[in-house]
Amino acid sequence: MTLRALSTIPSVNRSIVRCTRCPRLRAYCRRVARDKKREFRDWEYWGKPVPGFGDPDARLLVVGLAPAAHGANRTGRMFTGDSSGSWLYEALYRHGFASQPQSLSRDDGLTLNDCYIAAAARCAPPGNKPSRLELDRCRPYLAAELRLLRRVRVVVTLGRVAHENWLKAAGWWERLSPGARPVFAHGTMTQLPDGMIVIASYHPSRQNTNTGKLTRTMWHAVFERVAAVLEHHG
């Protein structure tokens, strides 16, 4: 069955978990799951592609880069078990999109309201850098989610790779001339011809948060803007 034939988010998620399109990434995820990190040696790592997570009727879509090797690749849930997730879920909770401010494991009771989380790549990549070919192979899953998440009005892209891959999955990369495409710069908000609003943000990775490139004030301003836009649109 093709991805286009899938008619529900759960069916897309099952297809993601079974994916074997990228041998390098599958081998890496399995190796990480086998060798583990010392502090997580008692965990049974997920070690498979990570599906999307959240409310299928969401108006907010958050698009990240890829699972972290000892984060979502360990826990099996997007942005769960690492510092990036701590930043994301704390902000989602503060603005009413999450039931709790922490995300530690996929059975911790966390639920999302009016928010769905996806990613450009679904397998943890070595060095946090999926190849262009791997992103191309994975993009149909994001496109399938976009087709089924019919109520989304605002998209937050976390990092340039997520930003550009969302534009490609949504079809805007081809439809818009290079000069008309929404540029990636932290805090920029663009309304597309169909009314969709995309807000770009630096990714809440340690590389950005520990260096001050992304501060808490900058981060929360993104979600304050999201909340304001959704309130305005009803």
Predicted regions and their residues:
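A polyanion-binding, active-site-adjacent surface
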Residues: 6-233
